[in-house]
């Protein structure tokens, strides 16, 4: 398989992550090109703003052609250490991996589920992404 890494449109912190993706892909026998029109597109984020705004054109074209897009994004767990990688998104719409995992990774990362807390102080404000994002 050939992967096309759109490194020109990545966030400032994307360089080492794109490089790690490339090293891993090559170790598995895949070809890698950069900022080309050949191969499976790999973009940084589905936030269409700033440096990453040009990724929207890549995303839209691939989705219209029914081609997958691999999306890399900052992770929710240990930000700056772990990264999200999904096919056709990074959150609710993405495909991440086969189901049926036993949950051992949670223990490996020392993640603990805490009990729900009631808020006695009033409302909770949820702030979501803006209109320049597919998230």
Language-model segments: residues:
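Catalytic core of nucleotide-activated saccharide and alditol-phosphate transferases
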Residues: 37, 41-135
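N-terminal pre-catalytic "stem/leader" segment of glycosyltransferase-like enzymes
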Residues: 1-53, 133
């Amino acid at each position: 398989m050939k992967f096309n890494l759109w490194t020109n449109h990545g966030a400032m912190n994307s360089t080492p992550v794109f490089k790690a993706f490339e090293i891993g892909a090559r170790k598995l026998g895949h070809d890698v090109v950069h900022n080309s029109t050949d191969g499976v597109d790999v973009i940084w984020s589905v936030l269409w703003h700033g440096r990453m705004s040009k990724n929207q054109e890549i995303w839209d074209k691939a989705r219209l052609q029914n081609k997958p897009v691999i999306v890399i994004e900052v992770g929710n767990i240990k930000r700056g250490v772990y990264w999200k990688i999904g096919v056709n998104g990074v959150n609710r719409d993405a495909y991440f991996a086969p189901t049926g995992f036993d949950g051992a990774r949670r223990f490996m990362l020392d993640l603990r589920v805490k009990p729900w807390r009631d808020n006695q102080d009033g409302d909770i404000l949820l702030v979501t992404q803006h209109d320049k994002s597919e998230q």
